A protein has these predicted regions:
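Residue-level signal for threonine
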Residues: 18
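Glycine-centered positions within short beta-strands or beta-hairpins
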Residues: 8-12
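Short, structured surface segments that line ligand/substrate-binding pockets
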Residues: 54
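Charged interaction scaffolds used for protein-protein
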Residues: 1-7, 27-40, 45, 57-130
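Short amphipathic alpha-helical "interface-anchor" segments enriched in bulky aromatics
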Residues: 15, 23-29
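Active-site/pore-lining binding-face segments in mid-to-C-terminal subdomains
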Residues: 51
Length: 130
């Protein structure tokens, strides 16, 4: 589980997702957590739900609260994709649910020699299985 710095809604805030939190997102949205990224269904409603779950260790805020704050931030000139969507995607990948290859693609600074060798071996095995 990776903590992703996210100070947009409060100083020193970070978000994270673990299996329990991903289950909460699935219950709230009716969609499998992995499908959110794979099917590119990260719309505004989904963003507010994910933010309410991924940041709840700081304060319990509703998706509606995040929608209102996002509106204010957009009016102030933030970029939704750069400032909100990309960190949320990193947070989802940081949970590990999308697999090691996606994780290391988004967090290349954490790639070690042993992890690189493991990913290479997994790719070779996947090709053999085709």
């Amino acid at each position: 589980m990776k903590k992703v710095e996210f100070p947009l809604f409060g100083e020193n805030e970070y978000m994270f997702l673990n299996i329990g939190r991903l289950i909460d997102i699935e219950r709230m949205t009716g969609k499998p957590a992995g499908d959110i990224i794979k099917n590119q269904s990260l719309d505004l409603g989904m963003l507010t739900i994910i933010l309410s779950v991924a940041l709840r260790h700081h304060k319990m805020r509703t998706p509606q609260w995040y929608a209102e704050k996002m509106q204010e931030l957009v009016e102030e000139g933030i970029e939704l994709e750069t400032d909100i969507q990309i960190p949320v995607v990193k947070c989802i990948a940081g949970s590990g649910i999308l697999g090691k290859a996606v994780y290391y693609k988004l967090f290349p600074e954490e790639m070690t020699d042993s992890a690189s060798k493991e990913l290479t071996a997994e790719r070779k095995n996947a090709r053999k299985g085709r």
